[in-house]
Curated annotation (Swiss-Prot):
UniProt protein name: RxLR effector protein PITG_06094
Record remark: domains: The RxLR-dEER motif acts to carry the protein into the host cell cytoplasm through binding to cell surface phosphatidylinositol-3-phosphate.
Induction annotation: Expression is induced during host plant infection.
Cross-referenced Pfam families: RXLR
Highest classification ranks of the organism: Eukaryota, Sar, Stramenopiles, Oomycota, Peronosporales
Source organism of the structure: Phytophthora infestans (strain T30-4)
Region annotated Disordered, chain positions: 56-88
Length: 162
């Protein structure tokens, strides 16, 4: 009786381990397929990025003189500052979207951006990126909502010092 019980428990354990290892293999295969599909998409994105990074020679730089030839690797696109601003906005857009209720509450309690800066504990030289992005998001929210007709004449909307 004891021997049959031990054999049954052992076989059940081995069967459970075999099924678990089979299911892990299936998951790994599907993850590899997903990654390969993602890599296909990434190559298209990388091609577009390379296209944007190309630098075109000006009419003045057409000479073959090595002093006048510029290296295309070191050349930067003209819209670099705009691209960096867009990427920064994308980076903090999730934070700003999640803070909309906070912005609404601050605005309903008639807090100016200066009051919000004090509430967040920001100073001129502080390096708190998340709090700075929250503050910048509120400044945008404040400017947008103070431009509405019903809010223009409110005292806290007339404050222009941030």
């Amino acid at each position: 009786m004891r021997l049959s019980f031990i054999l049954a428990a052992t076989l059940t354990g081995l069967l459970a381990c075999a099924t678990a290892s089979d299911s892990e293999k299936i998951i790994r295969i599907s993850n590899e397929q997903v990654l390969s599909d993602r890599q296909l998409l990434d190559t298209v994105v990388n091609d577009n990025e390379k296209r944007f990074l190309r630098a075109y020679n000006d009419a003045e730089d057409d000479s073959e003189d090595p002093k006048n030839v510029k290296n295309t690797v070191d050349a930067k696109p003209a819209d670099e500052s705009e691209d960096s601003e867009l990427s920064e906005e994308e980076r903090f857009s999730l934070i700003q979207m999640s803070n909309q209720p906070r912005y609404y509450w601050w605005f309903q309690h008639e807090m100016t951006p200066r009051d919000v800066r004090r509430a967040l504990g920001l100073r001129a030289g502080s390096i708190k990126l998340v709090k700075r992005s929250i503050y910048r998001g509120y400044v945008k929210y404040y400017n947008k909502h103070c431009s509405y007709y019903e809010n223009r004449k409110k005292d806290f909307c007339k404050a222009k010092e941030y």
